């Protein structure tokens, strides 16, 4: 997909059929918060996630949930699947909850966009603008420091300095709910 001349998608495809989905960035941040909510059992989450479908819920619920995940990740229908398996999930480098102020101020500073008053912004547009924020913004600085592997820094003083910054900007650990045998 080329965003310079193609519109952002408003639908997902489930078993060959197109379904309209919510596209506003606020709804997708809520989607992420729901997924991350340790208090909500996975079966209930899946049912709640189906509310992101506007014009009816697909019959194949599992595929429907995966289609929403693909939309969240901005996967296009003809995108090649990444075949590499790393064995672990990538490290979380930002949180829409914990970094909200930094994200908000970066959008105001760089793009002149007030995320509270803008009536609508497509999730993919939001993500594209977020990725394009300059490195000098606070959120990009936090992401950069959180991503540094201290083992790669040879200089002891520099490693100590970076470690101190990482402790300051670290994401707070959430208590993850343990899954039951039925999940």
Regions found by a protein language model. Give the residues of each.
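Short conserved micro-motifs at the rims of enzyme active sites and ligand-binding pockets
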Residues: 33
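Charged interaction scaffolds used for protein-protein
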Residues: 1-20, 26, 36-40, 47-183
């Amino acid at each position: 997909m080329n965003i310079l001349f193609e519109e952002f998608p408003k639908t997902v495809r489930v078993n060959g059929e197109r379904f309209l989905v919510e596209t506003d960035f606020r709804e997708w941040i809520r989607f992420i918060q729901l997924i991350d909510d340790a208090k909500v059992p996975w079966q209930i989450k899946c049912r709640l996630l189906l509310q992101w479908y506007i014009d009816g819920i697909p019959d194949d619920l599992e595929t429907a949930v995966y289609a929403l995940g693909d939309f969240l990740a901005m996967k296009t229908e003809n995108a090649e699947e990444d075949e590499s398996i790393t064995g672990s999930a990538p490290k979380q480098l930002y949180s829409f909850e914990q970094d909200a102020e930094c994200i908000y101020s970066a959008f105001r500073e760089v793009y002149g966009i007030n995320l509270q008053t803008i009536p609508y912004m497509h999730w993919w547009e939001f993500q594209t603008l977020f990725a394009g924020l300059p490195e000098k913004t606070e959120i990009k600085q936090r992401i950069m420091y959180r991503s540094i592997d201290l083992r790669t820094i040879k200089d002891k003083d520099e490693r100590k300095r970076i470690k101190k910054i990482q402790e300051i900007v670290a994401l707070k650990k959430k208590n993850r709910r343990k899954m039951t045998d039925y999940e």
